[in-house]
Amino acid sequence: MTSHGDIRSTIVYNNGYVYFTTKGGYLYRVQMNADGTFGTACSYNLGGMATASPVVYKGRIYVGVCGNGEQFSSDGGHHFAVLTETASGISLAYNVSIPGYPQAAPLLSTAYENQDYNGDGQADGRVYLYFTYNAKPGGIYMLSD
C-alpha cells in the first residue's frame, strides 16, 4: 500500500480496521483481514499535514490538522477535524479552529457520556476530547462532541 506523504502517527486499531495520518494531509482507514493481511483501504484529504494519531470511537474519527500558515503560528489555520465513518468511506462532520497545530493524539473521555445535558430524559452520548497544541505559550484544548 502506498500513502500520500510520510506516516508520522501511531497506527490505531478499531473494529477490524487500522487508521493513521500522513504529513501529506491524509487520514487512512485500512481493513485488516483475519490472516493479518490488508484489505480494502480508503483515505480522506484533511487539507493539511497531520502527524497526530487519530482517535476512533463510535463511528467518529478525531484528528488534529496543521493549517496552511506557519506551523507554530497561532493564526495558521490549524484545526481539529471530526469525521464520520461509514462502510463505504469517511466524510467530514465538522472542523474546529484551534490556536496552534495539534501534533499529539487526543485523550477521549466517556465519563459524561450517559449524562442528560438537554433535559429530555435521554443520555446525550457526549464525549470530551483533550489535546495539546503548539503555539506560544502552548496549551491544552477541550472539545465536546
What are the functions of these language-model segments?
Residues M1-D145:
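Extracytoplasmic/lumenal domain signature
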